[in-house]
Swiss-Prot record:
GO biological process terms held by the UniProt record: negative regulation of DNA-templated transcription initiation
CDD domains cross-referenced by the UniProt entry: MraZ_C (cd16321), MraZ_N (cd16320)
Gene3D superfamilies: Transcriptional regulator MraZ domain
Single GO cellular component term: nucleoid
Location(s) in or outside the cell: Cytoplasm, Nucleoid
Organism listed in the record: Parvibaculum lavamentivorans (strain DS-1 / DSM 13023 / NCIMB 13966)
Subunit structure: Forms oligomers.
Keywords associated with the record: Cytoplasm, DNA-binding, Repeat, Transcription, Transcription regulation
Family, as annotated: Belongs to the MraZ family.
Protein name: Transcriptional regulator MraZ
One example GO MF annotation: DNA-binding transcription factor activity
Signal peptide feature range: none
Pfam family name, one: MraZ
Length: 161
C-alpha cells in the first residue's frame, strides 16, 4: 500500500500523544521513515496536514521550482518546512503532536485521521464532521475533474449514473 486511505478516530493522551493508525504507519515505514511529517495546511480549515517522506520530497521539488528569493517561496517554505515537524513513532505507534500544530487545528482530546492519497489530514472530530457534510454536498460537481487513464473505465458518451 502506497497511499493513505480511510478514516480513523483516536484519543490524544494527557502528554499530547496520539496513536497513528496502523495502515498509515505502514505507508510511512514503507517509504523509509519510522514516523510521519506534519505541517500546517495551505487551505482553509482547522486540521493538520501529514505525510510520509515521499510527499515531503515532492514538496521540496515543488519549492525548488520557484525563484529561491521570491516572497512566495519564502512564505510557502516557512509554512511547509519551517512549521513542519518530523514525528517519530514510539514503541506503541504513537507520536507526540506539537503544541503549535494542536492549537492551530483546535485538537484537544480526540482526532480524526483522514486519508488523502499521498498525504493525510488530522482533524478535530466536529470540524471534520462539518467538512465531510459539505464535501458530500459539493463533490458531485467535481466528478468531471476525475479523468480515468484507462479507456475501459471511461463512461460511454460521457453518461453518468
Amino acid at each position: 500500500m502506497n497511499s493513505f486511505r480511510g478514516r480513523y478516530t483516536n484519543k490524544i493522551d494527557s502528554k499530547g500523544r496520539v496513536s497513528v493508525p496502523a495502515k498509515f504507519r505502514a505507508v510511512s515505514i514503507a517509504q523509509g521513515l519510522n514516523g510521519i511529517i506534519c505541517f500546517p495546511p495551505l487551505s482553509e480549515g482547522k486540521f493538520i496536514e501529514g505525510c510520509g517522506p515521499a510527499f515531503s520530497e515532492e514538496i521540496d521539488r515543488m519549492l525548488d521550482r520557484l525563484d529561491p528569493f521570491s516572497e512566495e517561496r519564502d512564505m510557502l517554505a516557512s509554512v511547509l518546512l519551517g512549521e513542519s515537524a518530523e514525528l517519530m513513532f514510539d514503541a506503541d505507534g504513537r507520536v507526540n503532536l506539537p503544541d503549535n500544530l494542536r492549537e492551530l487545528a483546535g485538537l484537544t482530546d480526540e482526532v480524526v485521521f483522514v486519508g488523502a492519497g499521498p498525504r493525510f489530514q488530522i482533524w478535530e472530530p466536529g470540524a471534520y464532521a462539518a467538512f465531510a457534510v459539505e464535501a458530500q454536498k459539493r463533490v458531485p460537481g467535481f466528478r468531471e475533474l476525475l479523468k480515468s487513464t484507462q479507456a475501459s473505465l471511461r463512461p460511454e458518451g460521457g453518461g453518468g449514473r
